[in-house]
UniProtKB/Swiss-Prot annotation:
This is Argininosuccinate lyase. The lineage of its organism: Bacteria, Bacillati, Bacillota, Bacilli, Bacillales. GO terms for biological process: arginine biosynthetic process via ornithine; L-arginine biosynthetic process. One of its GO terms (cellular component) is cytosol. Belongs to the lyase 1 family. Argininosuccinate lyase subfamily. It catalyses: 2-(N(omega)-L-arginino)succinate = fumarate + L-arginine. The keyword Lyase applies. Gene3D superfamilies: Fumarase/aspartase (C-terminal domain), Fumarase/aspartase (Central domain), Fumarase/aspartase (N-terminal domain).
C-alpha cells in the first residue's frame, strides 16, 4: 500500500518495521475525537474560503458516515495506514474520492493528534469527576448511618483515641474533594485547542484557529505553535491527579482489608466484592480492595513512564510522543473501574458496630481524656501526661483498664481526681466532648455532613 506521505521515499519499509511504528492498535480509541476534530477543521476551511462549500459538504458527509460506522464498530483499521489519522483519511478518500485529500490542508498530524487527546481527556476527566462525586455520596450515606458508631482512632496503627466511624469515613470524603478540585482545575489547561498549529510553525493558509476551537467547545487556543504540538503537560497532570486519587483509594482499601480480617472484624465485605480460596473452604478474601490497592502502582507507573519519555525531548514533535497514549488510556480505564468498584464495595459492606465498640472499651485510648481532665483542673499538661502514663503502666501490670481503677488509687496519683472522672472515661463521652472545629464530636460531624451534602447535592438529585 502506498503511504499518504510516501512521495519522498523510494523503498518500502519491512512489514515488521511498519508494525513496530504503527499505533493504530491503541490510538483507534481516538476515532470519535479524530473525526469530530476533522469536521471542525473542514468547516473552518470552508468559512475561510480555503476549500469550497461544496467540497466541505462532501467531506463532512463522508466523515459523518465514518463516524456512524465507528459507533457501530464497523470500521476496519489497517497497520499499513499506521495511525488513526491516516486510517480515517484513507477511508475518507476511498469513500468520497480525491477531494477527501483536501481535508488535511493547513493541518499536520502533530496538531491533529494533540487535538484528539485534548478532546478525549476533556470528556474522560468530566466522567471521572462525576464518578468520584458518586463515590462521595456513598461515603456521606455511610457516615450518616454511623455518626454514633464509636471506633478506635489510630496512629502508628496503634489505638490512639476513640473517634466516630463517621468521622473516619468523612476524612476520605475530603480527600476525594481535593481530587475533584484538582481534576476540575486541570480542565482549564485541557480545554484549549492546538488545532491549526501545524507541524510546528503554523501554516501559510489563512486559517481561523479561534473558530475551529469554538466549534470543538474549547475555551481558547495555544498561543505558541511549538508549544501546542509538543505539550503533554495536560496528560502528565491527568496522570498525576489520577495517581493522587488512586493513592487515596489505596489507603482506604488497606484499612478495609485490615478491618475485614479476623483480627479486627470491624466490617464484613459483601459476597459480591469478595472471593474464596481454591483450597481453604473457610476463606472470604477482600480481593476487590486488594486489586484497587495493587492497581495504584500501575497508575503511578504510567505517570513515571511519561515523565521519563518527556524529560529529554527537544522541541517540537518527536516520535517518542507516541508513547503518551497507552498509559493515558490505561489510567482512564483503571481509575473509572476502581471508582465504580469502590462505590459498590462501600455501599454494600456491613459495619460491625459491636466489635468497634468493644475495641474502645478494652484498651487505653481514653488515656488522653484523663490528661485533659487534669489539665482542665489547672495542672500543666506535661505533668498530667506523666501521671496518666504511670496509671497506664499500673493498669498493664495489673491486667486491668482505666475504667477498672478505683477512685482511691486515682487519688493516690493526684488529689485533683474526683468522682466525675468516670464520666469522661466513657468512649461515647470522649467522642462527644471533642467538639472543636473539624473534630470527631457529634455536632461537628453533623456540620461536616451538611457541608458534604452541599458539595454532592447535584449528584444526589441525579
Amino acid at each position: 500500500m502506498s503511504k499518504l506521505w510516501g512521495g519522498r521515499f523510494t523503498e518500502e519499509a519491512e512489514a515488521w518495521v511498519e508494525e513496530f511504528g504503527a499505533s493504530i492498535s491503541f490510538d483507534q480509541q481516538l476515532v470519535n475525537q479524530d473525526i469530530n476534530g476533522s469536521m471542525a477543521h473542514v468547516t473552518m476551511l470552508a468559512k475561510q474560503g480555503i476549500v469550497t462549500q461544496e467540497e466541505a459538504e462532501k467531506i463532512k458527509i463522508g466523515l459523518q458516515y465514518l463516524l456512524k460506522e465507528a459507533k457501530e464498530n464497523k470500521l476496519q483499521f489497517s497497520v499499513e495506514a499506521e495511525d488513526i489519522h491516516l486510517n480515517i483519511e484513507k477511508m475518507l478518500i476511498e469513500q468520497i474520492g480525491e477531494v477527501g485529500g483536501k481535508l488535511h490542508t493547513g493541518r499536520s498530524r502533530n496538531d491533529q493528534v494533540a487535538t484528539d487527546m485534548h478532546l478525549y481527556l476533556k470528556e474522560k476527566v468530566e466522567h471521572i469527576i462525576k464518578a468520584t462525586k458518586q463515590l462521595q455520596t456513598v461515603l456521606v450515606h455511610q457516615a450518616e448511618n454511623n455518626i454514633e458508631t464509636i471506633m478506635p482512632g489510630y496512629t502508628h496503627l496503634q489505638r490512639a483515641q476513640p473517634i466516630s466511624f463517621a468521622h473516619h469515613i468523612l476524612a476520605y470524603f475530603w480527600m476525594l474533594e481535593r481530587d475533584v478540585n484538582r481534576y476540575e482545575d486541570s480542565l482549564k489547561r485541557i480545554n484549549i485547542s492546538p488545532l491549526g498549529a501545524g507541524a510546528l510553525a503554523g501554516t501559510t493558509f489563512p486559517i481561523d484557529r479561534e473558530y475551529s476551537a469554538e466549534l470543538l467547545g474549547f475555551n481558547g487556543i495555544y498561543e505558541n505553535s511549538l508549544d501546542a504540538v509538543s505539550d503533554r503537560d495536560f496528560i502528565l497532570e491527568f496522570l498525576s491527579n489520577s495517581s493522587m486519587l488512586m493513592m487515596h483509594l489505596s489507603r482506604f482499601c488497606e484499612e478495609l482489608i485490615l478491618w475485614s480480617s479476623q483480627e479486627f472484624q470491624f466490617i464484613e465485605m459483601s459476597d459480591q466484592y469478595a472471593t474464596g480460596s481454591s483450597i481453604m473452604p473457610q476463606k472470604k478474601n477482600p480481593d476487590m480492595a486488594e486489586l484497587i490497592r495493587g492497581k495504584t502502582g500501575r497508575v503511578y507507573g504510567n505517570l513515571f513512564s511519561l515523565l521519563t519519555v518527556m524529560k529529554g525531548l527537544p522541541l517540537a514533535y518527536n516520535k517518542d510522543l507516541q508513547e503518551d497514549k497507552e498509559g493515558m488510556f490505561d489510567t482512564v480505564k483503571t481509575v473509572e473501574g476502581c471508582l465504580h468498584i469502590m462505590a459498590g464495595m462501600l455501599e454494600t459492606m456491613t459495619v460491625n458496630k459491636e466489635k468497634m465498640g468493644q475495641a474502645v472499651t478494652q484498651d487505653f485510648s481514653n488515656a488522653t481524656e484523663i490528661a485533659d481532665y487534669l489539665a482542665n483542673k489547672g495542672l500543666p499538661f506535661r505533668q498530667a501526661h506523666e501521671i496518666v502514663g504511670k496509671l497506664v503502666l499500673y493498669c498493664t501490670q495489673k491486667g486491668i483498664y482505666l475504667l477498672d481503677v478505683s477512685l482511691e488509687t486515682y487519688k493516690e496519683m493526684s488529689s485533683l481526681f474526683e468522682e466525675d472522672l468516670y464520666e469522661v472515661l466513657s468512649p461515647y463521652a470522649a467522642v462527644k466532648r471533642r467538639n472543636s472545629a473539624g473534630g470527631t464530636g457529634f455536632e461537628q460531624i453533623k456540620n461536616a455532613l451538611e457541608k458534604a451534602k452541599g458539595l454532592t447535592k447535584e449528584v444526589i438529585k441525579g
